[in-house]
Amino acid sequence: MEQAKTLFFTTPKQVEVRETPLPPLKADEVLVQTICSAISAGTELLVYRGQFPQLSEAHDAVSSGLKYPLAYGYACVGKVKGVGKAVNREWEDRSVFSFQPHTSYFAAKIENLFPIPHSLSPQNACFLPNMETAVNLVQDGAPILGERVLVLGQGVVGLLTASLLSEFPLEYLVTADQFEFRRQTSGKINKVISLDNLNAGEAKAQFHSSGYAQNTFDLTFELSGSPSALNDAIEYTAFSGRIVIGSWYGRKRAEIDLGGAFHRSRIKLISSQVSTISPELSGRWDKSRRFDVAWKALERIKPEKWVTHRFSIDEAEKAYQLLDENPQEAIQVLFKYDDVV
């Protein structure tokens, strides 16, 4: 009998792949064979390192709570291999996306599946959750014609956000990251000026020599995953500017200086999380409309060019060790299944 291989986080910095029988199909379900799944490094490293908070509700639909052992992940692309009795057979062999943990097979109801546009490869489709996040960030930031925008952090979400922002008629768009590889990648995006991260003295000197003084930016996105970066965001955001905080920090802590210029700067701090839609938009926007925007953005940007590493699901330990110990070498890491990719 065919077995499903599922990745489990068992304790901090320990993962294992478990084999289980394929789930029996209910009448309203389909069986999906996974082609590839994407590691969301920022979120999954919190789980891998044991830095996630104990939540009464998970931040997504994957599980109702975060505790070990935990099957986690939310970016699976696969092909429908079987359909339940109540499901239209047109679903057979259809390529689909689902918010599922890393697993080689899974059963799902069709309302939890997203048909993938024919113009997108499976690897491009793996970026859907992060693209939806980027769309949500840009909507929450609401950039205005001629604004000066700064994006701190050029991981996958930062690169996608910068790519969307590059389509706006801004005065300038600046990105910053501590890793040279990510800065080089970001600098290839149209209209982006990519600089070193702002923490070190040399980096700040470079920033100022480039003509970007303190209190410069109308809109800043904090996407680095480091709570201390909020100090940089505050320092470089102009009077009455906005800071959109898209990072999930988990249990990471940092001292934030709110006693200086921040007190009189009237800066607005905006927490942005993709599970909801901003109240200002929810009367006209729903998740379906936002997903449509995300699919179209994937077709334009084609982010699979940012896939730096591909591992078999059986090599999961190597994948997380890479992201944990050598993050400067990686951008997007994918799992592949049965050499399909």
Mark where each language-model region is.
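C-terminal substrate-binding/catalytic core of Rossmann-like NAD(P)-dependent dehydrogenases/reductases
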Residues: 214, 256-307
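A glycine-/small-residue-rich N-terminal strand-loop-strand element
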Residues: 75-99
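C-terminal hydrophobic helical "lid"/dimerization subdomain
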Residues: 285-341
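Mid-domain Rossmann-like dinucleotide-binding core that forms the NAD(H)/NADP(H) cofactor-binding site
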Residues: 121-199
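N-terminal glycine-rich beta->alpha transition that marks the start or flank
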Residues: 20-76
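A structural motif shared across PLP-dependent enzymes of the aminotransferase-like
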Residues: 99-110
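Glycine-rich cofactor phosphate-binding loops and adjacent beta1-alpha1 units
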Residues: 184, 188-270
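Short, well-ordered loop/turn sites that connect or cap secondary structure elements
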Residues: 89-91, 143, 237
